[in-house]
Design a protein with these regions (language model features):
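A short glycine-rich, His/Asp/Glu-containing loop-to-beta-strand
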Residues: 1-37, 85-115
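Conserved hydrophobic/aromatic beta-strand scaffold that supports enzyme active sites
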Residues: 19-23, 41, 59-61, 67-69, ...
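Short histidine-centered beta-strand/loop micro-motifs
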Residues: 30-36, 53, 79-81, 108-112, ...
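Glycine- and acidic-residue-biased ligand/ion/polar-headgroup-sensing regions
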Residues: 37-55, 113-128
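Short acidic-glycine-tyrosine-enriched beta hairpin
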Residues: 55-75, 129-146
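A short hydrophobic beta-strand segment most commonly corresponding to one strand
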Residues: 77-100, 152-161
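Acidic/His-leaning functional-site neighborhoods
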Residues: 97-149
């Protein structure tokens, strides 16, 4: 038997969120049933894929560097087809009714308006003189400012709605 996919799911914070990853070869096709799907955002590390909802017309093509929101698909079965070797990291709620906002951090000074989480998706960005690695995460607090250097990495910021 040939294994052509690797995936992982890790609960990260007192029933708040989890990080998942999917690493597959070109041509891989997978279906995520609605009852198993808690992903709200995905960051694509490499490759590209078709991402669609089963039994609905159309699909999105997501590719390396894309930050893809799937809130509108949270209560649907979805399908992924890898158009090339493909890897993505996902941010998951652990309670479907709990909504989160998410975005990629691009600024040098992060001014936080709500308590939230920073997650390293790729590379080795620096937050407050601390170098991070992929999957590192930590809390940020309302009213605080954080010095950020993302020239060597990608950070996501997530806050509860």
């Amino acid at each position: 038997m040939k294994i052509n996919s690797k995936n992982a799911f890790t609960k990260c914070r007192d029933d708040d969120f989890a990080i998942c990853s999917l690493d597959v070869k070109k041509g891989w096709i997978g279906i995520e049933p609605e009852q198993s799907s808690f992903g709200l955002y995905y960051y694509v590390l490499k490759g590209s894929c078709k991402f669609g909802v089963t039994l609905k017309k159309g699909f999105d093509i997501i590719k390396e560097g894309d930050f893809y929101c799937t809130k509108d698909k949270l209560y649907d079965h979805f399908i992924i087809e890898a158009l090339e070797d493909f890897c993505m990291i996902g941010f998951n709620t652990l309670d479907k009714p709990q909504d989160w906002n998410g975005r990629i951090v691009n600024e040098d000074i992060l001014k936080v308006e709500k308590d939230g989480m920073l997650i390293c998706f790729d590379g080795s960005p620096v937050v407050e003189d601390q170098q991070l690695a992929m999957f590192d995460y930590g809390s940020v607090h309302s009213g605080q400012e954080y010095s950020i250097d993302v020239t060597e990495g990608v950070l996501g910021l997530f806050t509860k709605c």
